[in-house]
Amino acid sequence: MKKKLLAGAITLLSVATLAACSKGSEGADLISMKGDIITEHQFYEQVKNNPSAQQVLLNMTIQKVFEKQYGSELDDKEVDDTIAEEKKQYGENYQRVLSQAGMTLETRKAQIRTSKLVELAVKKVAEAELTDEAYKKAFDEYTPDVTAQIIRLNNEDKAKEVLEKAKAEGADFAQLAKDNSTDEKTKENGGEITFDSASTEVPEQVKKAAFALDVDGVSDVITATGTQAYSSQYYIVKLTKKTEKSSNIDDYKEKLKTVILTQKQNDSTFVQSIIGKELQAANIKVKDQAFQNIFTQYIGGGDSSSSSSTSNE
């Protein structure tokens, strides 16, 4: 999924809402037994220092702040479309995946909506910063479309063996891709794929190697990070077509805009700064000492601390 599911989110959201009845009252009884009870307040006092519970309270705050500021600009269809994509990806296992993450369909929708609201806020700020300097920097770093044939393998020794065949005179690279590549999306087409420097379908190491090749050139074995943790995949690339880069920046203006905005969305420091500004503007007051530090990753010290101060009012 594009956004990670929060494990235990349903339970923790329920826990976080107990804060409302934690002050001045034991709240309702949650558990009764022979000779004793467990109240909402007792439960709240036990869990409020749990890092997971604190993270959920932070998420709830962000959700409310961004919903108030940007909620009217987000169409529910965007959320529904994302849910539809996830259902297509996971098929009949979708409900099980949600359940394992401690979520229902409704809580997942709420999570997606919050993510999209943050994305909307980031996009607005990023668009306001689309300066000539930003465009020039993106243009200097941009490489237009190339077409290549790619063979992906999971074993380095196998990759070296295939490379030897690929560099042999008269080698049929397309057939080698069909016979050996583990990339199901491209192998049947002889490994052919078109991409530019902004594409995400191809690892950065592979793009860099491909851009350095002449047409009909074949790379050495390229090692890239695999999809599994601490794993590697091995690529062999043959460049078949190279687009000459225009010297006129206006020819790429729309593409460069997309590149810049995507970079901003992927810049965790930039995203955190936007969230921090919105939280400060909302004049957040923390009512329980246990939660006084949950906003520090977004709101630093100095003047900003007054916007997330602890209050006993």
UniProtKB/Swiss-Prot annotation:
Primary location recorded for the protein, binned into one broad class: membrane
Domain PpiC: 143-241
Signal peptide: 1-20
InterPro entries per UniProt: Foldase_PrsA, PPIase_dom_sf, PPIase_PpiC, PrsA_foldase, Trigger_fact/SurA_dom_sf
One biological process term in Gene Ontology: protein folding
Keywords: Cell membrane, Isomerase, Lipoprotein, Membrane, Palmitate, Rotamase, Signal
Cellular component annotations (GO), alphabetically ordered: plasma membrane
Known EC number: 5.2.1.8
Pfam families, alphabetized: Rotamase (PF00639)
General function of this protein: Plays a major role in protein secretion by helping the post-translocational extracellular folding of several secreted proteins.
Family: Belongs to the PrsA family.
Protein name in UniProt: Foldase protein PrsA
Organism this protein belongs to: Streptococcus pneumoniae (strain P1031)
